């Protein structure tokens, strides 16, 4: 079946240094509370427990140089530089060695968060 009930977003493609082809971004996996200084900055208890994981939609990704409008209804649109790893092979419960071998490349990513919304929802015990 190829028909869909609504139009699907295009898969974002990012340029790759010294390559004529781009890297398609199908999924974005993120790691939270893996940086103690940032956890302290956010006002949460700094512990050494395992970090937590979450996803972001590649449909919301923009390439470098694109202007991102300040979202209405927020007072604190926060930015963070992130290390981005691009995988060249699928992984599931991989060893550290297999995970390293699956890395296609790396780059920089700018994460934008509506921090006031995040803090308000955290106070309500919401993710």
Please give the residue ranges for each predicted region.
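Catalytic-core "active-site belt" of small-molecule-metabolizing enzymes
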Residues: 1-127
